[in-house]
From Swiss-Prot:
Residues 82-127 are annotated as: Disordered. One of its GO terms (molecular function) is aspartic-type endopeptidase activity. GO terms for biological process: cellular response to hydroxyurea; proteasomal protein catabolic process; protein processing; regulation of DNA stability; regulation of protein stability. Belongs to the DDI1 family. Keywords: Aspartyl protease, Chromosome, Cytoplasm, Hydrolase, Protease. The gene is ddi2. Aspartic protease that mediates the cleavage of NFE2L1/NRF1 at 'Leu-104', thereby promoting release of NFE2L1/NRF1 from the endoplasmic reticulum membrane. Ubiquitination of NFE2L1/NRF1 is a prerequisite for cleavage, suggesting that DDI2 specifically recognizes and binds ubiquitinated NFE2L1/NRF1. Seems to act as a proteasomal shuttle which links the proteasome and replication fork proteins like RTF2. Required for cellular survival following replication stress. Residues 1-81 form the Ubiquitin-like domain. GO terms for cellular component: chromosome; cytosol. It is found in: Cytoplasm, Cytosol; Chromosome. This is Protein DDI1 homolog 2. It comes from the Eukaryota.
Length: 393
């Protein structure tokens, strides 16, 4: 018969595995098999089935009622506390009952009131938020992992408020303990209860997701980073523009602000107005059927669809890329114009428009997008006016 074992270690880490055994298999031998799978010594394990601990190692599994497809819980026993030979200051052992001894106090021993507990004798780690906070602040690597895996606790840690950090830590510990109790209750429930089985399935799925994410963080941390988008320098109607290269876009587009800056709004054919649909929707003002785009030393004919609200100035779509047989060479970080053989380098992040950078300036994320667009449009118009003044005789 196939028995599924849900194992909970002392550190609350979990593992699930299955064992194929006979019904007359003794519990002692079953513990040994579990030790091989889980790494937990057989003497430290407690096996629970149907909310009942299995204690007699000489009995067979079938005598406990186990059958094919059942689930048992294997828990690692708590480690016995080791105490130094010298007595701890501030701890009173006189009230501890010793098995086989009288529980009455020894009249020859003076009864002293217990002093207040000494904070130095508290368990270290999670039971001492102040110490844990100091350890995390002193370890940049652990702090970075905490920011990735537990943002609420990291935020409380960096706030500098010990009381807030303690509160968040205790809330998370209580929530984890509650989930652990719920998980144990589900695994001990009736195996024919559909609701319980559905919750167990969801719990296993979430566990697999967390395990997959942990492996990805260890083996491929670069997958959690962001890449810089592909931009090139070009000129439209003689005006410099930073163009976004997007082979997934069907058509080449330009923002209304960029079209005004390049003085091609007079060429917009409004009969081509409509709605552009992609991740979102935007209004198309019209189309410029032919304009000149300069990339390095090449002058290429191009058409644009003008969008009313577009954060980027210009986007080179697949129509433009296929027309001029362009190829994206990521190894050399260049865009190759196939019809001419010209190479142009993709821009580094520092030269990208602000809307395309991975990190905006301080406080920029708090500014509404409409206000950012208004500022950029005002800057463009002002720059255009300054250039016009400079060209006057």
């Amino acid at each position: 018969m196939l028995i599924t074992v849900y194992c909970v270690r002392r550190d609350l880490s979990e593992i699930t595995f299955s064992l194929e055994v006979d019904g007359d298999f003794e519990l002692e031998n079953f513990r040994a098999l579990c030790e091989l799978e889980s790494g937990i010594p057989a003497s430290d394990t407690l096996i629970v089935y149907a909310e009942r601990p299995l204690t007699d190692n000489q009995r067979s599994l079938a005598s406990y009622g186990l059958k094919d497809g059942d689930v048992v819980i294997l828990r690692q026993k708590e480690a016995p506390e080791t105490r130094p030979a010298a007595p701890f200051p501030g701890l009173d052992f006189s009230t501890i009952a010793v098995p086989g001894a009288s529980s009455q106090p020894d009249p020859s021993q003076p009864q002293a009131p217990p002093p207040p507990p000494d904070t130095s004798s508290f368990p270290q780690g999670l039971d001492n938020p102040a110490l844990l906070r100091q350890m995390l602040l002193a370890n940049p690597h652990e702090l970075s992992l905490l920011k990735e895996r537990n943002p609420p606790l990291a935020e409380a840690l960096l706030s500098g408020d010990l009381e807030k950090f303690t509160k968040v830590l205790q809330e998370q510990q209580q929530e984890r303990a509650r989930r652990e109790q719920e998980r144990i209750r589900l695994y001990s429930a009736d195996p024919f209860d559909l609701d319980a089985q559905a919750k167990i399935e969801e719990d296993i799925r979430q566990h697999n997701i967390e395990e997959n994410m942990t492996i990805a963080m260890e083996e491929a941390p670069e997958s959690f980073g962001q890449v810089v988008m592909l931009y090139i320098n070009c000129k439209v109607n003689g005006y410099p523009v930073k163009a976004f290269v997007d082979s997934g876009a069907q058509m080449t587009i330009m923002s209304q602000a960029c079209a005004e800056r390049c003085h091609i709004m007079r060429l917009v054919d409004r009969r081509w107005a409509g709605i552009a649909k992609g991740v979102g929707t935007q209004k198309i003002i019209g189309r410029v059927h032919l304009a000149q785009v300069q990339i390095e030393g090449d002058f290429l004919p191009c058409s644009f669809s003008i969008l009313e609200e577009q954060p980027m100035d210009m986007l080179l779509g697949l129509d433009m890329l296929k027309r001029h047989q362009c190829s994206i060479d990521l190894e050399k970080n260049v865009l190759v114009i196939g019809t001419t053989g010209t190479h142009t380098t993709f821009l580094p992040e520092g030269e990208l428009p602000e809307c395309a950078r991975l990190a905006y300036g301080p406080g920029r994320e708090e500014v509404p997008p409409e206000e950012i667009a208004d500022r950029e449009l005002a800057e463009v118009l002002q720059k255009s006016a300054d250039e016009a003044d400079q060209q006057k005789p």
